[in-house]
UniProtKB/Swiss-Prot annotation:
InterPro entries cross-referenced by the UniProt entry: ADH-like_C, ADH-like_N, ADH_Zn_CS, GroES-like_sf, NAD(P)-bd_dom_sf
Name the UniProt record assigns to this protein: Alcohol dehydrogenase 2
Native organism: Solanum lycopersicum
Cofactor-binding details, from the entry: Binds 2 Zn(2+) ions per subunit.
GO biological process, one term: alkaloid metabolic process
The protein's enzyme class: oxidoreductase
Binding site for Zn(2+) 1: C48, T50, H70, C178
Main localization (coarse): cytoplasm
Annotated family: Belongs to the zinc-containing alcohol dehydrogenase family.
Lineage, highest ranks first: Eukaryota, Viridiplantae, Streptophyta, Embryophyta, Tracheophyta
Gene name per UniProt: ADH2
Cofactor: Zn(2+)
Amino acid sequence: MSTTVGQVIRCKAAVAWEAGKPLVMEEVDVAPPQKMEVRLKILYTSLCHTDVYFWEAKGQNPVFPRILGHEAAGIVESVGEGVTDLAPGDHVLPVFTGECKDCAHCKSEESNMCSLLRINTDRGVMLNDGKSRFSINGNPIYHFVGTSTFSEYTVVHVGCVAKINPLAPLDKVCVLSCGISTGLGASLNVAKPTKGSSVAIFGLGAVGLAAAEGARIAGASRIIGVDLNASRFEQAKKFGVTEFVNPKDYSKPVQEVIAEMTDGGVDRSVECTGHIDAMISAFECVHDGWGVAVLVGVPHKEAVFKTHPLNFLNERTLKGTFFGNYKPRSDIPCVVEKYMNKELELEKFITHTLPFAEINKAFDLMLKGEGLRCIITMAD
């Protein structure tokens, strides 16, 4: 790889030229990394709902043409000025949010919301000089959440790159750079269920199942899955879910159903849908005195959370979380080690594998609600 250091690399990338239209495989030029940047060779990437959401461009600022993608794994090809903790050949996970290690958030043991590198979905350029590292015929192609992994090579700020165990299989651990870590950490780091406790998981997609996996790892004895789609229930058993509730089967609010099932409420709940009614139910279904509800899903911008203040006065706790409270550079390597030590199973999240040339099929699968994670193999 040393022959490419300092040179523009021409490679394949799946470019989103406009909202909702199939990605187009293009030859793009990828400039060398600048100060505090690294250029990565992406080996595996997967598709997350966030990619689809911004590809559809419903309700946010459309930024096109753009290279999407943010769940991935690869190898460092070269590093820019000032980069000291990464070197060519390192195995890494690029992450959509960062850890500069200098701001108040990064120095805090409680926060992972880096002031410098926190996710920015509107920015399509690099922080260093306000320019894109991607171009076609000299015209810029914009970045996505600082990662743009639907390209054979990409340039990322060093603070958004987690160096991992080189023995870890990149085609498995690539899913840890977004959704799976988000759900897992929501349980392990924020809800913190104790051994033998009860946990309700709202939404049994990939993030919700990762939250269930976290509850299972923590030793919860009852994990109640709540979803409007009963076809998800059988699969969820693999992730430790012991009981299921479909709100459509009841005439009363689901929080009342869960309270009756659990003698007053669950010890913990994790909400992964982003629907405001589910968020309220997730809070109101936890037990008074000690119950903790954790919100993961992102609601509609005009949604309003309404609950009676007595629900707080009766000592229920409501928390929110971002990326499972994991600091990308400090913590994600440890999550990879959980997988390597067989504490965490990733294979059951991976339901499809496709070659890079068929990336649009991955979008079709997600739009149909088929499967959890589709791994896209970049090599021919």
